[in-house]
Amino acid sequence: RLYLFVAIDRTSKFAYAELHPKATRMVARDFLSKLINTVPYVIHTLLTDNGIQFAKRKGTEGYREIPFDRVCRAQGIEHRLTKVCHPWTNGQVERMNRTIKEATVKRYHYQSHDQLKAHLQTFLMAYNFARRLKTLKGLTLYEFICKAWTNTPDRFKINPLQHTVGLNTYIATDEGWLYLAGIKDL
C-alpha cells in the first residue's frame, strides 16, 4: 500500500506528487520541503485537507506545532485547511488524484512500487512540460510559468528556464537516477 501526496498550483496547474509507504507528519513535512525546492516561484498559501499529517486534532491546540506548520512558518507560507466534509473545496487536487490514477494504476500493472514511482514521475514530467490546457489558453504548464516569470519576476526564486527538460535527461530520485527520453514539446 502506498500513499499519494499531491500538490497542484491553482493558477498554473503545475503538479507535484510523490508516493510514500506511510502518511506521517514527517513524510508530509519532507514532501512540503521538496515541493518548495522544486517549484521556481515563491509559495504564499497552501490549502490542505484536515489529515492528521497536516493539522492538529481538536483538543491538541495547546501542544507543540506540527512539523508541516513549522516548515510553513519558516518559509512565510500561510497554511489553510479545507472545511471538514467539504472535499470540493480541494477540487483541483481531487481531480489531479483521479487523473494520476487513470494514467497509472487503473491502466497498467506494476511489478514493484519502484516501477510505479518511476512511471508516476514520467507522467508528471509529460503533464507539466508537454500537456496543453485550454484553461491556460493552449499553453503548457511550463510555458505558462515562463510567461508569468517574464511578467512578474519578483514572484520567483529562480529563473524557471532552469527547469527545461531536454533529450537524454536524468533526474535524481530516492532510488538513484531516472532516465527520461526527451519530453520536449515539438
Predicted regions span which residues?
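C-terminal domain-tail junction helix/linker
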Residues: 75-77, 98-186
